């Protein structure tokens, strides 16, 4: 049965349901707009709660996303888009250069009219660093999980390599005949003496003045 009083929808055989999208898992969720149009670079776009998210961030590093997209990859792109928006807002509070992306590169890392209050800057930038680390942990976890076309990726333990590099870079001191040297190698006498009144005072004993030393 057609809408609009039983008359067929405009355009002939195309119905209103087909224009709006199928309901259910394949349709758009509440607050989401799905665009089926492909860009020249072959990535899709979604608008979720006013934030435009695409799969181009993940497609750059993993070309298989163009063939096998997963639902959580949209979540990644949405999280990245929100993070970039927060970066722009935080950058506007401490710098007037106009583009926060310039600070990502060493040759363009100069700031203009930057606030001199280090505490204020740290308070503004710290949430961005925490969110970035948290997002990276989520990405690393999902990246390590197996997929139909990829085996499980195990995390590489690097602390043993770092320890070996430190031992290789270590050079013994020549003054000690090849042994290790430090500022605390000299013998330090921690004995304050049994005749000292400090020990008696700390132990609660009555303080007694030591007898004068007789010099022969």
Curated annotation (Swiss-Prot):
Molecular function per GO: protein serine/threonine phosphatase activity; protein tyrosine phosphatase activity
Biased composition (Low complexity): 21-32
Keywords assigned by UniProt, alphabetized: Early protein, Hydrolase, Protein phosphatase
Induction per the UniProt record: VP1 and VP2 are detected 12 hours post infection, while VP3 only after 24 hours.
Acidic residues bias: start-end ranges: 172-187
Annotated segments matching region Disordered: 1-50, 165-187
InterPro entries in the cross-refs: HEV_TT_vir_Orf2/Gyrovir_Vp2_N (IPR004118)
EC number: 3.1.3.16, 3.1.3.48
Catalytic activity as recorded in UniProt: O-phospho-L-tyrosyl-[protein] + H2O = L-tyrosyl-[protein] + phosphate; O-phospho-L-seryl-[protein] + H2O = L-seryl-[protein] + phosphate; O-phospho-L-threonyl-[protein] + H2O = L-threonyl-[protein] + phosphate
Residues annotated as the enzyme's active site: 95
Consequence recorded when altering residue 97 to S: 70% loss of phosphotyrosine activity. 700% increase of phosphoserine/phosphothreonine phosphatase activity. Reduced cytopathogenicity and marked inhibition of viral growth in cell culture
Broad enzyme group: hydrolase
Described purpose of this protein according to its UniProt entry: May act as a scaffold protein in virion assembly. May also play a role in intracellular signaling during viral replication.
Family as reported in the entry's similarity comment: Belongs to the gyrovirus protein VP2 family.
Protein name: Dual specificity protein phosphatase VP2
Species this protein is from: Chicken anemia virus (isolate Australia/CAU269-7/2000) (CAV)
Gene from which this protein is expressed: VP2
């Amino acid at each position: 049965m057609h809408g609009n009083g039983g008359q067929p929808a405009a355009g002939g055989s195309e119905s209103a349901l087909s224009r709006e999208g199928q309901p259910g898992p394949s349709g758009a969720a509440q607050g989401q707009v799905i665009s089926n149009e492909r860009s020249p670079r072959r990535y899709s776009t979604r608008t979720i709660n006013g934030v435009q998210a695409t799969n181009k961030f993940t497609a750059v590093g993993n070309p298989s996303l163009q063939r096998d997209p997963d639902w959580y990859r949209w979540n990644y792109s949405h999280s990245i888009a929100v993070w970039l928006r927060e970066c722009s807002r935080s950058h506007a509070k401490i710098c007037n250069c106009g583009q926060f992306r310039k600070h990502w590169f060493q040759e363009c890392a100069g700031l203009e009219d930057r606030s001199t209050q280090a505490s204020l800057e740290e308070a503004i930038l710290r949430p961005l660093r925490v969110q970035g680390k948290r997002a990276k942990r989520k990405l690393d976890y999902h990246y390590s999980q197996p997929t139909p076309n990829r085996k499980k990726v195990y995390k590489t333990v690097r602390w043993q390599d770092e320890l070996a590099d430190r031992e290789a870079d270590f050079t013994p001191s020549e003054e000690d005949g090849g042994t290790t040297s430090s500022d605390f190698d000299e013998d330090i006498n921690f004995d304050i003496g049994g005749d000292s009144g400090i020990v008696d005072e700390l132990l609660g004993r009555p303080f007694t003045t030591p007898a004068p030393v007789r010099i022969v």
